[in-house]
Amino acid sequence: MKSEKVAESNNFFAVRDLNPVSEGHTLVIPKKHFVTLLDIPNKLGEEMLKFTKKVAGDLLDEKLGDGFNVIMNNLEVAGQLVMHAHIHVIPRKEGDGIRFFYKA
């Protein structure tokens, strides 16, 4: 099954998650292979954050949420299921019922 590509740059692309937590749940993925955040060179990491900001802004512009979470799971113990670095951008709405394992 293919996922819908929603954005692309020279080094990254963004696709809708195949098992979304919320409508518009999007993954930001580097085109080059890295396993975790620690493997991504600093300059590319900065570019990844800028690209993630663009994706998050687009989700809000599309009215898919009133806020968003940005999450990156690194290694299996932290919930990483695919061993290719990626960032989850999860649109949120008031009362959506989504709960994470920690308290802010």
Model-derived segments and their meaning:
Residues M1-A104:
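HIT superfamily nucleotide-processing domains
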